[in-house]
Amino acid sequence: MAILVNKDTKVVVQGITGKEGSFHAKQCKEYGTQVVAGVTPGKGGMEVEGIPVFNTVKEAVKETGANCSLIFVPAPFAADAIVEALDAGIELVVCITEGIPVKDMMMVKDYMLKNYPNAKLVGPNCPGVITPGEAKVGIMPGHIFKRGKIGIVSRSGTLTYEAAYQLTKYGLGQSTAVGIGGDPVHGLTHRDVIEMFNKDPETEAILMIGEIGGTEEEEAAEYIEKEVDKPVFAYIAGITAPPGKRMGHAGAIIMGGKGTAKAKMEALEKAGAYVIENPAKIGETVAKILKVIELEEEERTSDAE
């Protein structure tokens, strides 16, 4: 089952005639994703990598039945592109674009809440979503992911890749990996995605990768403590980050003593998550702990018999 995307997902790429849009549309298509349309105003009637281009998302949806949008529109116009996708009936919007003004994203979030409360936005400033072997909607290198039972949710693109590579190396595949993005105002949160994984029968364990800034990891910890009965592993980047200095992502900043890696790690440990302190040990730690859990379950089963 996985979450968010699968082999039936039909993708429209907004900004497909640009350099990044055309390159990644081709990569997604080659992975096996149904990339059914592209959109660039004024370029309707063209084809990019055999994908028909339309002037509007509405037109693309009408002609192809697209239900997911992948956005590569420049930052000044990206908020309008998200709104256009929502207005066209798109259920899942994945926005890769970095550098969208905070006020633009606040407008988008407000617009979604009022008009499309059931629609889902991943990003912006994210690597996208991949369900290994079924669909890739984003910019991640597909070959490092393997079908399996661990759900990944992360604020960092490159740490997502590192974690997936390590898990795959230890024979642990992924159900779905979701890069939620590193901007301060964005769509789906850690908590949202963990809730989806918790309800997904194909996901048996969850790996969350957070970083300094904001309180989303703490909010996820509250949900984990109350609702999640699957093993949750967590890595928080930025242990040595100084207060007030932005660390890579726009949202990765400690302000007013809040958003520290230490506070997030403590909240997650209290919630029962397995907190990993070294990013090089993610795969090894997950593999070891899952093996212990498996052995404990086998012992309980044999005792019951």
Curated annotation (Swiss-Prot):
CoA binds at residues 17-20, 43, 96-98. Substrate binds at residue 161. Pathway: Carbohydrate metabolism; tricarboxylic acid cycle; succinate from succinyl-CoA (ligase route): step 1/1. The keyword Transcription regulation does not apply. PANTHER family: SUCCINATE--COA LIGASE [ADP_GDP-FORMING] SUBUNIT ALPHA, MITOCHONDRIAL, SUCCINYL-COA LIGASE SUBUNIT ALPHA. Belongs to the succinate/malate CoA ligase alpha subunit family. Heterotetramer of two alpha and two beta subunits. This is Succinate--CoA ligase [ADP-forming] subunit alpha. It comes from Aquifex aeolicus (strain VF5). The gene is sucD.
